[in-house]
Amino acid sequence: TALKESGGFHSIITTIILFTIFAALIYTSNYYHVFGTSKIGEDVLYQTMKSIRTGIIIGTITTIFSLPIAIILGICSGYFGRTIDDIIQYIYTTISAIPGILLISAAVLSLQVWLGRHANWFSSMEESADMRLFMICFILGITGWTSLCRLLRGETLKIREMDYITAAKTLGVSNSSILYKHILPNVMHIVLIITVIDFSSLVLAEAVLSYIGVGVDPSTMSWGNMINSARLEMAREPAIWWSLAAAFIFMFSLVLAANIFADGVRAAFDPREKSNVETS
């Protein structure tokens, strides 16, 4: 019925299957090394589980940085138009024109030089690694807001022509009240969907950056560092492949779960999706 047609049924079934598989893995790990051990004898499943924390931290903190920028600039650009719209469009067009990996890599390499020159500011290697992780989140945040900003601008351009917005302006309602009470609630479904999709993209971005050597500190457990270490182990005879497989499986599962959640959010909050389900 409506739950099946909206995709919520499939999301629930897939979520139950994923939870069942991971619960079985965690229970079995009490007795066996499910994914084997690393070259120094560490349990690969434990490394993979701890890497989830790094992925969630990067996704969450990066979203905290990028979301306010995207929302404020996006709805202001679409609502006010003219000069403000031109300036904001110029900013996000310029940022989008620069290849993302090159921009982030250059910023992270500059950060590494800065951390090396001020190593005495940190009392331990853990503090330096945490600062590097935080700054990577900051860099990803200030460079990753453009796509959401563009979508919010387009949606705001349509909403500002609605009758209730025109009536609010006629009654003398301030622009700030219109933005906060009328426009922002009507674009939140886009914000939620894109935020969840971008979360999975950030997990993949961390893996790519760590693989090429400009990601989190090598001492920090992450899927990117696991894949980078497994690359050398794959050249052995016999090849040690299970560390690579574990990182890939967990990364794939997290990205899949995020996309399934995004579909559920879209089905729940997108007015067009609701109308399609009701008419069918």
Indicate residue ranges for each PLM-predicted region.
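Transmembrane alpha-helices
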Residues: 1-31
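Alpha-helical transmembrane segments of integral membrane proteins
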Residues: 13-14, 18-21, 37-280
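Short pre-catalytic strand/loop immediately N-terminal to key active-site residues, enriched for Gly-Thr
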Residues: 34
